[in-house]
Swiss-Prot record:
Keyword set includes Manganese: no
Protein name per UniProt: Nucleolar protein 9
Location in the cell: Nucleus, Nucleolus
InterPro entries: ARM-like, ARM-type_fold, NOP9, Pumilio_RNA-bd_rpt
GO annotation, biological process: endonucleolytic cleavage in 5'-ETS of tricistronic rRNA transcript (SSU-rRNA, 5.8S rRNA, LSU-rRNA); endonucleolytic cleavage in ITS1 to separate SSU-rRNA from 5.8S rRNA and LSU-rRNA from tricistronic rRNA transcript (SSU-rRNA, 5.8S rRNA, LSU-rRNA); endonucleolytic cleavage to generate mature 5'-end of SSU-rRNA from (SSU-rRNA, 5.8S rRNA, LSU-rRNA); ribosomal small subunit export from nucleus
Composition bias, Polar residues: 33-42
Main location: nucleus
Residues in Pumilio repeats: 86-121, 122-157, 182-217, 280-320, 328-363, 364-401, 505-542, 543-581
Keyword Protein transport included in the entry's annotation: no
Length: 656
């Protein structure tokens, strides 16, 4: 058969090309794939409004709890109880109000166990509706976390003394199971719903006994960046039930298994095996993988499915498992590697997938073009970094061999690549270490450049916030670059030397400004290592730093540098005493500063004033601890030589 060409080839390529749907929330475009109907897509979310007096009362209650100016815990508890009594029968009206929903969250965080169950009961029948509401969904998330903590409490202490109320005998586990049965028919609609998807993610985390992240935590598996910023602005502080793993009963694992089983059946139309699934259903599920709302949910599903599904059904629904390439899968992978949402999806699923699955994707689709993928700064580069972390030694070395020669070029647009390659090299027994160091020096400290300065090339000092008088906060980019330079300093002593050389080339005022900078001061701290820096360079650094040691001691960032100087001046007693005397001369200023007090204590200056011999003993002990094999500068008992030893032999006899 002849090689396909012309129109036939173009048609085949167009047929295999992966093009996700532009809209994911329109039922007509999804047919019956997502199982949505009019009720699921637009559930009832209006439950009435409060009258003016009620609204004013609850606004005042929210403000009171926000200020938290109660005299004692008992007074606050009584206030919470009174407000909860006032909310009876009005809970649904409150949770759909922007201000009153914050009140409900505060009440849920501060209420007791029985009050928590009563709030759960008030939401019976409308849990799905609330999960789809902008404000009520946040209330529901807080309620679910507190409920998970109560489930754990009842699991560990099954009997409670003094419980006579009939409601007290209803366990939180049963309350939870009732709620889960209520939302189960709506799971597919929740996956790509703007608000309900967050509730679904939280439910999966709870059922799988995973860590429940804080509502303001960075890189959270639960909330979006926009949601975390809004959470910080309303100033509702999480309690101890967040940011931890809760023990759950066996019934929760069974519920999770049932959740995912029903979802899989819906996504595959009940197909018995992977080969029986219609390509249309596979394509539509892949479209959900690149949907900004649904993608994080599917990532979490793939992460937890291995708890009870050894076949990894959802992974196999997204990717094939054969050893041969597939045109449609190849097109899908190419889309993932060039799309921001898709690359984030692939990066995350790689991190918790079986190694053999990741190796297959790498060998079939990514290995031949790994350098090109690394050059896709906002997409494929992150996937390549994930491969370096999770592939086996052989594949990691292959990637390093391809990327290390290009490292200086890759760092132009993605400084994180340097971190990934350094860590991969260390993990592989310092594989290609010398070449990595040379590439980094070519990039940041080239020999042919007479004005080379790693602080400028790496930290971009001239365009930074260093020295600004407007109290500008250090930027995220400055923080990222500073951390990278700190990693280089710890990676090899060559970077310690070039960093110190660069610091000494700066004007003294500019160098001292680094000591007061919220980010760059950490770079200064990292080079103050007495065992790595030779005595001459230590003295050169100290000559500059000693000039402003008092002001540095009273600064939030500079005080850490002065603390470091205590060890950095080991075996340099004159410099140590010079710093101690400088602090002593302005002792009032130092002691009146909270940062200066710590410096005073860390430098043992009370002993220096009252018992100078004890202070010198501490200094000598430190010298021995840091330089145990150091030879004294002069022998304790030098041999006495006669004065005439330097005379010529002919004149020695006459000298006595």
């Amino acid at each position: 058969m002849g090689k396909p060409r012309g129109r036939k080839l173009l048609k085949q390529q167009e047929k295999d090309q992966f093009k996700p749907a532009k809209e994911f929330d329109v039922p007509d475009e999804q047919d019956n794939f997502d199982g949505s109907n009019g009720t699921d897509s637009d559930p009832q979310m209006f439950f009435g409004v409060l009258d003016r007096e009620e609204l004013e009362y609850f606004k005042h209650a929210e403000a009171t709890l926000s200020m938290d100016a109660f005299d004692n815990a008992e007074e606050k508890k009584q206030f919470v109880t009174n407000v909860i009594e006032e909310t009876r029968g009005k809970e649904l009206k409150l949770v759909i109000s922007q201000i009153c929903s914050k009140l409900m969250e505060r009440l849920i965080l501060d209420c007791d166990d029985q009050q928590l169950k009563s709030i759960f009961k008030a939401f019976n029948g409308v849990f799905y509706n609330l999960s789809c509401h902008k404000y009520a969904s946040h209330v529901l998330e807080t309620l679910l976390v507190r409920g998970a903590a109560l489930v754990e409490k009842e699991l560990l202490t099954p009997s409670f003394d003094g419980e006579t109320d009939e409601e007290s005998f209803i366990t939180m586990e049963n309350v939870y199971l009732y709620m889960l049965n209520e939302v189960k028919p709506h799971l597919k609609a929740m996956i790509n719903h703007r608000y309900a998807s967050h509730v679904l993610r939280l439910l999966i985390l709870i059922l799988a006994s995973k860590n429940l992240p804080k509502t303001t935590q960075n890189n959270s598996t639960l909330r979006s960046k926009k949601s975390k910023i809004a959470r910080k602005m309303i100033d509702i502080k999480d309690n101890d039930d967040f940011d931890r793993v809760h023990q759950t009963p066996e019934s929760f694992k069974l519920e999770l298994k049932d959740f995912l089983k029903n979802l899989y059946a819906g996504f595959t139309n009940g197909a018995a095996s992977r080969s029986d699934i219609s390509p249309t259903y596979v394509t539509k599920f892949r479209e959900l993988c690149v949907d900004p709302v649904a993608s994080p949910v599917i990532q979490l599903i793939i992460q937890v499915e291995g708890i009870f599904d050894r076949e990894r059904s959802f992974w196999r629904l997204v990717f094939n498992t054969t050893d041969e390439t597939d045109a449609k899968e190849e097109a899908f992978l190419e889309y993932l590697l060039s799309d921001p949402v898709g690359s984030h999806f692939l990066e995350n699923v790689i991190s918790f997938a079986r190694t053999k699955f990741v190796e297959r994707l790498y060998n079939l689709y990514m290995k031949p073009k790994i350098t090109k993928l690394a050059q896709r700064d906002t997409t494929g580069a992150f996937v390549v970094q994930a491969l370096l972390r999770h592939l086996k030694d052989k594949e990691v070395k292959e990637i390093l061999e391809e990327l290390v020669p290009q490292l200086s070029m890759l760092l132009n647009s993605n400084i994180d690549f340097g971190t990934s390659i350094i860590e991969a090299s260390i993990k592989e027994d310092n594989y290609l270490r010398d070449e990595v160091i040379n590439q980094l020096l070519v990039k940041y400290y080239p020999e042919q450049n007479e004005n080379r300065n790693i602080l400028e090339s790496c930290l971009l000092l001239s365009s930074s916030t260093l020295g600004n008088t407007r109290d500008d906060w250090p930027t995220a980019e400055e923080r990222r670059r500073s951390l990278f330079l700190e990693q280089l300093i710890g990676y090899d002593s060559k970077f310690v030397d070039v960093t110190i050389e660069s610091m000494l080339k700066l004007p003294e005022e500019r160098f001292l400004q680094m000591a007061y900078h919220g980010v760059f001061s950490h770079v200064v701290e990292h080079v103050l290592k007495p065992t790595i820096v030779d005595a001459i360079k230590r003295k050169l650094l100290l000559n500059v730093l000693c000039k402003d040691v008092v002001n540095m001691s009273c600064n939030a960032y500079g005080s850490h540098i002065v603390d470091k100087l205590w060890e950095f001046t080991a075996k340099l007693t004159l410099y140590k005493e010079r710093i101690a005397n400088s602090l002593l001369k302005e002792s009032d200023k130092v002691k009146n500063s909270s940062y200066g007090k710590r410096v005073w204590r860390n430098w043992h200056l009370d002993q220096y004033v009252r018992k100078p011999m004890d202070w010198r003993r501490i200094v000598k002990e430190q010298d021995v601890a840091i330089f145990p094999n150091a030879q004294p500068l002069q022998p304790k008992n030098p041999l006495k030589r006669p004065k005439h030893t330097d005379l010529p032999p002919s004149k020695r006899k006459g000298v006595k």
